[in-house]
Amino acid sequence: MSSVAAAAEEAPTAHPQELVRALSLRDAIALVLTVIGTGVFLKAAPMAQIVGSPSKVLLAWLAAGLLSLAGALTYAELGAMMPEAGGEYVFLREAYGDLVGFLFGWSSVMLIASGGLAAVSNAVASFLAAFVSLDGVWITRELHLLGQTVHWQLGGQQLVAVAIIILFTAINARGLQLGAKVQWAATVAKVAGIVVIVLGAFLLSKTGSWSHLQKPVTAQIVPTGVGAFGAAMIASLWAYQGWSNLPMVGGEVEKPERNIPRALIYGMLLVIVVYFVTNLAFFYALPFSEVLTSNSTAYRNALPVASKAAQTFWSHGPQLVSLFFMIAAIGALNGITLMNARVPFAMARNGLFFRPLGVLSDRRVPARAIWFQGLWACLLALSGTFDQITTSVIFAVWLFTALVGSSLFVLRRKLPAAPRRYRAIGYPVVPALFVIVAAWLVLNSLFATPIESAAGLVLIAIGLPFYVFFRATRREVHADGEVAP
């Protein structure tokens, strides 16, 4: 019997409107490994175009990984101290008040998480197109939104994306046990796929040579320098995105004061190793010129770098990589669906979102919140605008990340007597460095993409009238399912 099933059986005396602590350490690590998505297969090319040498690309991967690890060490203390559904929403609410917590939750629910689901589901559909034709496009439109031109289209790929979102929404609304099983299976499959590509590149590649790492090439698109290295770091940080989601299911992790920190730290160390070794394999298998000209904004019709590397040891390598792409994307999709829906659930329980979303199903999962998130993501997936809109929230994502990091310092002073079974390693230096670098990334985004950053702030600010409404009509949903008077 799985740990999830066992926990569910052991909790019949608990109130049916209380979450079940059913996620084991293994399940929690699998959720952290949701981070391993399609980015590791794609990002080497744009990073190479920015910094112009293999060593700098690898260094950027390592630096981004260490930054993410510093963040994980910081989040670990917060997650262990406040193991509740909602994660970052809870941390920001406790440190800075309802408004800041709400604006994070609003952004997560309405754009960041749902946009991520739309993006990943369309990625799965595009990878599926390598095996099945999904070329039909029936409607195309252009919209002008927040100073940007948004291209809208409806076709076979969008419908498949919607079907995929509905499938994984239904799986996770069915129960925590099923969602956790799917996550573990996807994690094992995608790690196995990466191992196949890495071993094939190192042991069987017809073009493999360590000399590929010794030939720096001048970047063709962006000048090198500190700014360029920062841009490369930002590119790789998207591949690390998602490690912070585990605390969102803090209310369902067994022994959270131990397992949340351990899962975050062990999981991130594993991700750093996987990303570094995988990119090292790409540079070993391919001349740097091939990496430079792989699929990216500059070379839209080229093969992804992972496909090129696989092609050096097997003629059907690109098809193999497409399959692994799809598995990795499915794992990310399931993980986002499972974890992020706990944010609107927590907000609704606090009376700061639609109250029905704060009610659990008879299987003790926030099924209504899961379906709300999924259906909203379907609308974004149908529109096809997710990739352009989410570009506008890079600034906001890092703004909230910096705020969460700083909340550790605030809560150390605000709640000095709170139980802390785990304290952030390297405090205050490591959390401070994390906050400083996150703030630098906020400023970097602001100066590099001012229009998109401003648009991101506008999208967040749209939540303000909703906050006023929810505050005016606020009635909290208690853990026993009763609505406060």
Each predicted region: which residue ranges?
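Membrane-interface "cap" regions at the ends of multi-pass membrane proteins
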Residues: M1-P54, S68-L73, M82-A85, A417, ...
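Hydrophobic, membrane-embedded alpha-helices of multi-pass small-molecule transporters
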Residues: L23-F41, V160-F168, A201-L204, T218-V274, ...
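Hydrophobic transmembrane alpha-helices that form the core helical bundles
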Residues: P46-Q49, L69-I165, A170, M326-A346, ...
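A generic transmembrane alpha-helix motif of multi-pass inner-membrane proteins
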Residues: S55, T391-S392, A396-V397, G426-P485
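TM-loop-TM module centered on a large, flexible mid-protein loop between adjacent transmembrane helices
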Residues: V90-F91, G97, A129-H144, P216-Q220, ...
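Hydrophobic alpha-helical segments and their helix-loop junctions in multi-pass secondary transporters
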Residues: S126-D135, V188-V217, L237, L280-F288, ...
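C-terminal membrane-solvent junction of multi-pass transporters and transport-like membrane proteins
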Residues: Q153-L154, P356-A367, T401-E452, V477
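Membrane-interface loop-to-helix entry segments
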Residues: G156-W210, Q241, L264-M268, V393-L403, ...
